[in-house]
């Protein structure tokens, strides 16, 4: 009797090899970061005074403003800070914590109320209290515009637009939302601009580094970047030691615009800090699961397109993923079928 062999039965090697490819792709990001020395330079115990630490904890919601805090509440605040930033939890102002406090970051407070059970869904991602999101007819279309008077002297407007188109595309590829650029700043859903110091929203910027940008929760749509930063799109061209990657910050702030808070996963786009001269432009699983739980899934999205996002150029409508994504999708579909039929 002729036995019909399933094509996968004889080929455990190819299956293992395909997994190795997927594994390589997952680890791409770590490899890229390892090549960038600024990601891994650890300061010796930095010199930060206790009053400065307390000010930082107040600014980001860990300690009440204008109130003298006792040692117990200071220690509790440090524990919450360490937990929210994925640091070793010691309750002490140790060198890991101080190095983190010195890093440039998003100006949005971290989600720190101890009573966040309803929003902290056991995952690392976080929503704003009450889970606000953009509620419109599906498929959701949001417009965005740049304030023409408030751009950055470091970049050409075409570069700024290109970077934001790419950053919006990252989110559009995983949720059923499309982002459309408009000239009309006044009526745009999402209003993007670079501002100096006090700019009228009660959240003044602080000059070079420190706070890089801030955003308001849905459905406000204001996305403000600190004009004092040396914004960069290409570190080969921009040599400044305090240069900040615009795309990394754009991806993060758009996450807030959509309703995500800060994540404690260091590789997530929604992690609050970003070192100067470093890039973090891809969504992490944590970001994807978080935003999909608010808006649902883009019908074109597959996990493999996320894995292949290193090499994809998603358009802002999220519809096109380059051929590499297709190869990975096909590979892993084949793998899945092999396992089902083994």
Curated annotation (Swiss-Prot):
The keyword Lipoprotein applies. A motif (Cysteine switch) lies at residues 104-111. A lipid is attached at residue 317 (GPI-anchor amidated aspartate). One of its GO terms (cellular component) is extracellular matrix. Optimum temperature is 45-55 degrees Celsius. PROSITE patterns: ZINC_PROTEASE. Binds 1 zinc ion per subunit. Optimum pH is 5-9. Its cofactor is Zn(2+). Zn(2+) binds at residues 106, 252, 256, 262. It holds the Pfam family Peptidase_M10. GO terms for molecular function: metalloendopeptidase activity; zinc ion binding. It is found in: Cell membrane. Mostly expressed in flowers and stems, and, to a lower extent, in leaves and roots. Residues 1-34 form the signal peptide. It is a lipid-anchor; GPI-anchor. Its EC number is 3.4.24.-. Residues 35-124, 318-342 form a propeptide. The active site is at 253. Matrix metalloproteinases (MMPs) or matrixins may play a role in the degradation and remodeling of the extracellular matrix (ECM) during development or in response to stresses. Active on myelin basic protein (MBP) and, to some extent, on McaPLGLDpaAR-NH(2) (QF24) and beta-casein. The conserved cysteine present in the cysteine-switch motif binds the catalytic zinc ion, thus inhibiting the enzyme. The dissociation of the cysteine from the zinc ion upon the activation-peptide release activates the enzyme. Belongs to the peptidase M10A family. Matrix metalloproteinases (MMPs) subfamily. This is Metalloendoproteinase 4-MMP. It comes from Arabidopsis thaliana (Mouse-ear cress). The lineage of its organism: Eukaryota, Viridiplantae, Streptophyta, Embryophyta, Tracheophyta. The gene is 4MMP.
